[in-house]
Amino acid sequence: MSTLEFIKECQEKVFSGNHITAEDAEKLLNIPEENLKDLARCANEITRDFNGEKVDVEQLNNIKKNACSEDCTFCGQSAFFDTGIETYQLPSPEEVVSKAQKAKEEGAESYCLVAAWREPSRTDFEKVCKIITEINDKVGISVECSLGFLTQEQAKKLKDLKVKRYNHNLETAKSKFPEICTTHTYEDRLETLGIARDAGLELCTGGIIGLGETREQRLELTLELARLYPEEVTINILVPVPGTPLELQTDLPNSEIVRMFSVIRFLLPESVIKISGGRETNLEDSGEELLQSGANGIITSGYLTMGGNEAQKDHAMIEKIGLKSQ
């Protein structure tokens, strides 16, 4: 069987409602370079078949930029590293509502509230709940949250407030995780995802590629994501932050990024697969190729500690390649 025939066989499994195996995924991730376009094309056909031409466009609000207690080696907001990043406390509900309204007017269909802490204190959680209530009452945009570790009570409260989706990234493969973070475990992250799922929240999870992991470890992360089967996968591409242990990390080749997104699509045909942080910095085309290689979502107008494309530019890019953003 030729490589192209194998790719098509895997695609047919997906179209037939079956799952490809871990062995299939490994072979797909390791296909020869000359077949990479075949892999991307078939992943794109899966995306269109299961999800249509719509691209999920999201905006973030880093509502608390903090000196976080965790030592994640990629993060410019960790208190362990001297990165010179400005910190600030939770803004007023009025400030967040204004930004959420602007995001809606710019074509975002979801608005994610993100906070840099291990987990929310009781006081901070109550403030976030008030912000969510105000957005629901005054804006009417789909609210998502990324607030760190959750208790069962907090997850239930978010569900009661009509939060659609909870983000909590695995960050990397389990075998790589101890090199990336020592202040909590991989199991801690899985536990929070389970709590969110049990409360009825949709899941958004993923990680960062380009941390120095091997291709095998990217496969490991991908298979764990497939096991969780989240409604949304978010993949960041490392942008090294000066002052962090990964400040000198070399860029991941574009072909490795395409492989990752394409194989995730074979494993998760129905999920939103979102190109997140590092899109503009690492991809010369700002994601055009990936949106035709398995991805069907982007974050626009900036990230947690860095800027990004203006929404208008991203919507134009989506339309340029024949897809729809609204």
From Swiss-Prot:
User: What's the record's note on cofactor binding?
Assistant: Binds 1 [4Fe-4S] cluster. The cluster is coordinated with 3 cysteines and an exchangeable S-adenosyl-L-methionine. Binds 1 [2Fe-2S] cluster. The cluster is coordinated with 3 cysteines and 1 arginine.
Q: Describe its function.
A: Catalyzes the conversion of dethiobiotin (DTB) to biotin by the insertion of a sulfur atom into dethiobiotin via a radical-based mechanism.
Q: Which reaction does it catalyse?
A: (4R,5S)-dethiobiotin + (sulfur carrier)-SH + 2 reduced [2Fe-2S]-[ferredoxin] + 2 S-adenosyl-L-methionine = (sulfur carrier)-H + biotin + 2 5'-deoxyadenosine + 2 L-methionine + 2 oxidized [2Fe-2S]-[ferredoxin]
Q: Which family does it belong to?
A: Belongs to the radical SAM superfamily. Biotin synthase family.
Query: Which terms are listed as keywords in the entry?
Result: 2Fe-2S, 4Fe-4S, Biotin biosynthesis, Iron, Iron-sulfur, Metal-binding, S-adenosyl-L-methionine, Transferase
Q: What is its EC number?
A: 2.8.1.6
GO terms, biological process = biotin biosynthetic process
Name the Gene Ontology molecular function terms of this record.
2 iron, 2 sulfur cluster binding; 4 iron, 4 sulfur cluster binding; biotin synthase activity; iron ion binding
How is the quaternary structure described?
Homodimer.
Q: Give the species this sequence originates from.
A: Nitrosopumilus maritimus (strain SCM1)
The residues that hold [4Fe-4S] cluster are C68, C72, C75
Which domain of life does this protein belong to? Archaea
Q: Identify the InterPro entries for this entry.
A: Aldolase_TIM, BATS_dom, Biotin_synth/BioAB, Biotin_synthase, Elp3/MiaA/NifB-like_rSAM, rSAM
Query: NCBIfam families, per this entry?
Result: bioB
Q: Name one Pfam family in it.
A: Radical_SAM
**UniProt protein name:** Biotin synthase
Which pathway is recorded for this entry? Cofactor biosynthesis; biotin biosynthesis; biotin from 7,8-diaminononanoate: step 2/2
> Matching SUPFAM superfamilies, A to Z?
Radical SAM enzymes (SSF102114)
Q: Which residues bind [2Fe-2S] cluster?
A: C112, C145, C204, K274
Cofactor names: [4Fe-4S] cluster; [2Fe-2S] cluster
Domain named Radical SAM core is located at: 50-279
